Amino acid sequence: MKNIREIVKEKILILDGAMGTEIQKYNLTEEDFRGDRFRDVPGMMKGNNDMLNITRPDVISDIYRRYLEAGADIITANTFSCQRISQADYHLEDCAREMAFEGARLARIECDKFSTPDKPRFVAGDVGPTNKTCSMSPDVSDPAAREITYDELFTDVCEQVDGLIEGGADVILIETIFDTLNCKAMIDAAITMMKKHGVELPIMISLTVSDLAGRTLSGQTVDAFLASLSPYPIFSVGMNCAFGAPQMKPFIEHLAKVAPYYISAHPNAGLPNEMGQYDETAESMAPQIAEFIDEGIVNIIGGCCGTSPEFIAHYARSAEGKKPHQVVEKPKYMWLSGLDLLQVDDSVHLPVDASRFVNVGERCNVAGSRKFLRLINEKGYEEAIGIARKQVADGAAVVDVNMDDGLLDAKAEMMNFLNMIAAEPEIAKVPVMIDSSKWDVILAGLKCCQGKCVVNSISLKEGEEVFLSHARDVMRYGAAVVVMCFDEVGQATTYERRIEIAERAYHLLVDKLGMNPLDIIFDPNVLAIATGMEEHDNYAVEFIRATEWIHQNLPGAHVSGGVSNLSFSFRGNTYIREAIHCVFLHHAQKVGMDFGIVNAKARMDYDKIPKEQLELIEDVVLNRRKGAADDLIELAAEIKAKADAAKAAAKAGGAPAPKPAAPEWRKQAVEERLKYALQKGITEFLQPDIDEALQKYPHAVSVIEGPLMDGMNLVGELFGKGEMFLPQVVKTARTMKAAVSILQPHIEAEKQGGSTSAGKILMATVKGDVHDIGKNIVCVVMSCNNYDIIDLGVMVPAEQIVKKAIEEKVDAIGLSGLITPSLEEMVHTAQEMQKAGLRIPIMVGGATTSELHVALKIAPVYDGPVIWVKDASLNAGICARFLNETECPKFVAELDERYERLRNEYHEQQAKIASLEEARKNKLDLF
């Protein structure tokens, strides 16, 4: 039989549909899920679909069978949550591998029954994203904290994939990806286990875009996500969940144009309605899916939430005889990424006459910046982050980070700093260059970056074996790499040695390891000139010559260098140093230097250097005449003397140094300044602005309820429109917390030592639901807004929620849930609260929740206020209204009126539908 790699070129492959909603149709009980084996395991098991591979294999096999009968070519094993991380919620960690094995084994048995030479069937071992994230902090007060690490996730997924391969998987499907660092760890695990078993299975990747900004939950654009994947051997890339077909189609069209992989799509059966149900039928979805097929934008098509064998049968008929998508060529330019894509081609340039150039910011380097070293030593991370932020604002397209200092724990500091800047969207948008002479530091840094970063550096200094080992690590963790022109003999200082080492390294990397040459950046060693030693005078010229040779003879490779090394002899004379750098880059860029580690702010304009100075500096840089270095030293002394005299005169005259012009937003009213600061996450001016606001508002709490909450509401609106994305919202929340902390002493004074908490909120994901990422985000945002949060976690029974609410005397309760059964559990929780005499506000949120469901099902069974909250950024503002004695009655009245209107509209609509059904029943039967 043909394998999947052959068949995908010939036809559109049909992937199966939803598993969870199909399982629900069997109306399984808690006893069904437990079976005899897990009868005594504590907690609730219902909803843990993966355990049915062990306790009800008949149900799982039946679902597989029905999808195969419908025409599916690929059966997705029921193994989405077969990782220890996920099964820990059910106390079944030790059964995770067995579940994975059994899920794949059952699928293998059914696929083998249906396979024929003309239509072989394939098993996709399903790896879900887990409910943890490697890229985001669960703790608002500690942006560097992580709930799970790369290594922990890698270990758990290795165990899962090991079971999947042993069970008979033909493909590994990593799906519903919301965090690219999670995905990278999972790809790493899949490849590692394939090597163990001696197989090379195709890896399918399917991401989920979570907001209208078109980004993943962790903040990456689709293009940045593709860049992060580009070093890996990926079979297909696509999307699933979150969207129905019409909403997903523009993203799939884009992937089909730019992604050099087979393209997959398995959308939901439309978007959930207000009752958490999917309205699309197999018949209504068929023409939508036919558009994907007929327009040639997919190779693999299937279904996600709400789809069934009936849907898949329609898709299979639509795809029959249709041509699959033709995969586009791999890009001929380098892809790097942070939250955004950096494409190194003719579109990346500075205002000089070079075709392309990437500024690599040099100031986050403890070896090159005394200020940065001092800040890291003193744990002054906020100011250190400010240095990175300024570099990006000044034009750095990549940020170099180096923590190599004898008195620092370089590994810990590297991880801490990378995790911290990951929480700063204006920095995290650009790729990182992880710079260290210690390989364990580089490895630790690579495991912190969801984007495609650059390793600085590797070399042949310790021989080929170590060089190749390091290069394999670079490829394993999905990075590009700087290769120093350094070998076993030493550092290359001549043109001949530079090109000899570069050529040798290039062929080892490209021919022996299969590294993409576009991911190689050579550093032919920028060395100091004008040192007084004649043998150093030609260093810049030979670097430029080597750059040109590399550009012409090593296809795809790039060239970089630490530019400031060139002018080391002139340290203390900033003007001359920057002029030397400008002239050097002007000539080096012309012949192919496309990266440079520089101070982006200090870049000079070549055309604005005075003619006499320019000629002299070019004489030195290009080594055009003897004695030029001495002349430049004299010029440098003259310029420094004039600068020193000007400083002394200014000091003697008492003239203050000119202040930089204030940004435009600082000229607005204090309310607008505070709103802007929240939106952009700027903490620098909070103290003076809040001091000014306190002069204007009667009470400190009025500042919170006024301009600060106005700012938070604006952020909520922008997020809802897709004009802000989640990491920006989280940063806004941290800024809000900083503002509240400034106000706290004033609030305490006004309350004469009373509590400054805005209120105590209990949060829980309801019984039967293990999804908590959304809830965790709400907790972060709420705590930043000065609320005390009691987080009960996931799968929390109604009885526990009620008991804790009474014990802690909470002011409001937040209920979260992602899956449809959670809607019923929320109703039950409200009923239990009613029985217990609670009347505190309930906030409801989650993917399947809706205002209509609250109006129809929850509000009628509870006498306290209940509100549906659309997204995390709105909770604080809603709570503020509920807990304000003046606002609350008006707010509750508004809700009651709105719910009554929604109920009336719904019942009128249902009556019309019922009348139509009755009319059809009563039609005249003439045949």
Predicted stretch roles:
Residues 1-927:
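Domain-level signal for soluble alpha/beta catalytic cores
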